[in-house]
Amino acid sequence: SGCYEIAGKSDDEIAAMLDAQSPKFKFKSHVHYDSTICQYHERRHEICGRCVEACPTVAILKEDETKHLVFSHIDCVNCGGCVSVCPSGALDYSDIPRNSFAEIAKLYRGKIALIVPAKANLENLSVNLPANVLPFAVSGERFLSETHLLTLLQESGAQVVIYEQNIGKGTKDAVDIVNQIYELKFNEKAVLVAQNEDKLKSALSQAKFIEGSQYSVTEYALPKREIFARRLEWLVDGQNLGSVSTTELIRYGRVEINQDTCTLCLSCVGACNVAALVADKKTNSIVFNPSVCTACGYCELSCAEKDTIFLRPGKIDLEPSFFTFSELARDELFACIECGKEFATKKAVEKIASIMAPRFNGDKAKLKTLYCCSDCKAKVMIKAQMDQMREEVLNG
């Protein structure tokens, strides 16, 4: 009946009975998640959620109140779609992590890779593989991103053929971007996609090695965007090849800062978790590298000043400056008028002084503290209080 009498049973006996009756399911965790670089995790504003949108089941859900991603690995169908659309690389494919993929790609040097889903029905295919074509079986047909594709292309030095009837949106956009890049550089397509047997035969007959495209790099411990940037920088090779349009799923952009209103509070730097915006302590400036920017817009939302930082999303510029840090804003440090220690930027001090000075109603001590470091502020105020007490005592 599903009812059990537990009267007279000890706690251990009850627990053992529940364990015996509870169903047990075995499942694999196909996705690895790094919350430290996730662009949804604990953000004040929702700026990303592509993985949830890409998931065909309820394996990934958003917890809007805490801005946490909730994973149900038992509901995962192992398609890998979430991995291909993750902009920062916070999601990685556990079956073939990026580092493992790079090592496997090295084995394809001098070969033309034919990517085939492990679940594909190959028995009914009547296809003869040309010389130098080597199949690459993948269990998740939609995990391939632009980083995976460029890694395989450069390590092999040849075009890549994908045989997949229902290619994922993230992988489709990645193929489009990589093809644009190769057409500008080599005047050749990089990836040939075949969705049926006839197209597969055609793609295999066309696939070839691309002279001057083979390149190997160590990807260990590098984030997703930086891997792609390093490989792309080598391909550009100091030339100006033009621009590549990007999509909503794979976004790039450039950040601009109005130096007249920027106080170098570094809120934008703290908001950027992919290190596209960095504070340069040597020059006391904010520098920006567009090749790793995901165009999330969180820097705009985090800026304390009005009309100061602007994001211009849309394209990848195939030129040397796209891969280097450029200065967006700079200011000199302000020295404490008491001890001479530099403690803040000049613009920040001047802005606070302009706001607070009218509120201090000519109080010389308080006005002085606006230009002092934290240590000297206290000293100035204590001295002012002691002087006031001394004056009151002397005046009776």
Regions found by a protein language model. Name each.
Residues E164-K169, A194-D198:
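Short beta-alpha junction loops
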Residues R50, P56-G81, P87-S88, D92-Y108, ...:
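Basic, glycine-/proline-tolerant helical and adjacent loop/strand elements
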Residues S35, E63-I162, G168-Q180, S326-G396:
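Iron-sulfur-cluster electron-transfer modules
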Residues S1-A54, V58, K111-S126, E183, ...:
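Ferredoxin-type iron-sulfur electron-transfer modules and their immediate structural context
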Residues S145, G157-V161, I167-E188, S291-S302, ...:
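C-terminal, active-site-flanking charged/polar segments
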Residues F143-T147, T263, S267, Y298:
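Short, well-structured alpha-helical interface segments that form or flank functional binding sites
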